[in-house]
A protein has these predicted regions:
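Outer-membrane beta-barrel proteins
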Residues: 11-36, 55, 109-142, 198-214
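Short glycine/proline-enriched coil/turn segments at helix->beta-strand junctions
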Residues: 37, 104-107, 147, 222-223
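Outer-membrane beta-barrel translocator domains and adjoining extracellular loop/strand segments
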Residues: 11, 17-23, 54-60, 127, ...
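Solvent-exposed loop segments that connect transmembrane elements
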Residues: 55-121, 167-201, 247-272
Length: 272
C-alpha cells in the first residue's frame, strides 16, 4: 500500500577557466499510498540548490593564446605587449593579493536561508556568480468514482529564490589586456582608505512563489464519446530586489536610489 523513493546528488567542480567552479545539490523524495481500490495519493518534493561562477565577457585572443593570435591574418594588435594567461584569464573571476584579501569582510546572499560568510575561494573575487534554488512540492489524488468516471487532482507549490551578482558603483579598472576588467586590488584598497565603498558587488535577487490546483474529471458517456472537464487555478507572487553582496573592503555604501534606503543612506551588507 505504501511505496517510498528518494535520491540525493552532490556536484562540485573547478571548471575550465578561473572562477567557473560549481557547487550544487539535487534532491528528490516521493511517496505513493493506496488508501483503497478507489483512492490513491502521491506526494513528491524535489529541488536543486546550486551556485556557480560565470565567465561572461570576451577577452582578447592574445591573452588566451598568443601564438594562435599571431597566426591570424586579420589580427592587427601588437600581441607582444598583451600578457598571456591562458586558462587563468577571466573577465569575471579575478585573483586578489593576500594584502587585499585581508581587508575583505563577508559576502551575503540568500537561497531560502541567508548566507553570510567567506567567498567560495579566499583569494578569488567572482564578479558574476549565479545562485538559485527552485523547489517544487505536489500532492496528487486519484479517485476512481466508478467504471466510467474518475477524478484526478493535484495541489502544488513552486518556489524560487536566488539571483546573480555583478558590480555596482564606481570600480577601479585594469586595461593591461587591452579590454578592461575590474582591478579588484585597487578597488579594495580604495574602499578601505575611504571607509565608504565607491564600488561594490550587488545581488540581483529573484524571489517567487506559485500555488496551484489542477483538477480534471473524466467521464465516458459511451464507447464513442469521452468527456473531460477541469479547473486550473494558480496564484503567483514574484519580485525583484537588488541588495549589497560585498562591500569590497569598505564599511558601508551610500545608497539613494530606493525607497527602502536608510535615513542616512548608509547601506550595509544585505541591505537593498
Amino acid at each position: 500500500k505504501l511505496a517510498l523513493s528518494g535520491a540525493l546528488v552532490r556536484k562540485t567542480g573547478d571548471g575550465y577557466y578561473t572562477g567557473t567552479w560549481t557547487d550544487a545539490y539535487a534532491y528528490f523524495f516521493g511517496a505513493t499510498y493506496n488508501l483503497n481500490d478507489q483512492h490513491r495519493f502521491q506526494f513528491y518534493a524535489l529541488g536543486a540548490p546550486q551556485r556557480h561562477g560565470q565567465n561572461m565577457y570576451k577577452l582578447n585572443v592574445a591573452s588566451l593564446d598568443r601564438s594562435f593570435a599571431e597566426s591570424l591574418e586579420d589580427y592587427n594588435a601588437d600581441v607582444s605587449e598583451i600578457p598571456e594567461c591562458g586558462r587563468d584569464c577571466s573577465g569575471t573571476g579575478s585573483s586578489v593579493s593576500d594584502e587585499a584579501a585581508a581587508l575583505l569582510g563577508d559576502q551575503q546572499f540568500e537561497m531560502y536561508t541567508e548566507y553570510k560568510g567567506k567567498r567560495h575561494e579566499d583569494n578569488l573575487i567572482n564578479e558574476r556568480e549565479n545562485f538559485f534554488h527552485k523547489p517544487q512540492v505536489a500532492l496528487n489524488h486519484y479517485f476512481d468514482i466508478n467504471d466510467k468516471m474518475n477524478l484526478i487532482s493535484s495541489a502544488y507549490w513552486s518556489g524560487g529564490m536566488g539571483g546573480g551578482s555583478g558590480t555596482y558603483g564606481s570600480m577601479e579598472w585594469d586595461y593591461s589586456n587591452v579590454q578592461r576588467v575590474v582591478d579588484y586590488d585597487a578597488t579594495i584598497f580604495e574602499n578601505d582608505s575611504l571607509g565608504a565603498s565607491s564600488g561594490i558587488l550587488r545581488n540581483s535577487n529573484n524571489r517567487q512563489t506559485t500555488l496551484g490546483l489542477l483538477s480534471k474529471l473524466n467521464y465516458d458517456v459511451s464507447p464513442d464519446l469521452k468527456t473531460q472537464v477541469g479547473i486550473d487555478y494558480r496564484y503567483a507572487r514574484i519580485y525583484h530586489v537588488k541588495t549589497i553582496r560585498d562591500l569590497l573592503g569598505g564599511d558601508y555604501y551610500m545608497t539613494s536610489d530606493s525607497e527602502f534606503d536608510s535615513d542616512n543612506g548608509q547601506g550595509g551588507l544585505g541591505d537593498p
